[in-house]
Structure formats: structure tokens, C-alpha cells
Amino acid sequence: MPTTISLIIFTFLSLGDSWNDFPSSNVPVYNMVTGIYAKFMKNSPNWPLSRCWLFIPQFAVYPEYFILSIRNTRRRNVL
């Protein structure tokens, strides 16, 4: 359940237009979301795995490609 909540929150964050100025706007929000996620997941047995998942999005240099792929698949499904 916490995994689903954090994935939904992070998806909404990544779909916003504020990715254009990522270093100034989204880093505090990202840290807050991952902090909440870490607080929920720390008691679970797969905590090291979930902790690795937290740092994967930081290496996404061009998140626009990810966002565009989501929008394209959504359009294809509608048509």
C-alpha cells in the first residue's frame, strides 16, 4: 500500500511542467515524498531494495522521454 501511494505521488510530480526547472522546484518535493516513503517502508523486510528504488529517478536526466511515452501509450489506448 505505501508503495502504491508513493508511486502515485511521484507520477503526479513527474507529469507536472515543473520538470523544466527541476533543480530549483522539484528537489524539495522529491525529498519530502521519498522521506515519507522511507518512513513507511523501513519496517518492511525488503527495505534495502526499496531504498535502492528511491535513488533511481535521480539518474533520469531526461524525464521528458518517460512522460512522452506515457502520453503516447495513453493516446494509443484511447484510439
UniProtKB/Swiss-Prot annotation:
Domain of life: Eukaryota
Keyword set includes Signal: yes
Keywords assigned by UniProt, alphabetized: Signal
Stated name of the protein: Uncharacterized protein C188.14
Signal peptide region: 1-18
Organism: Schizosaccharomyces pombe (strain 972 / ATCC 24843)
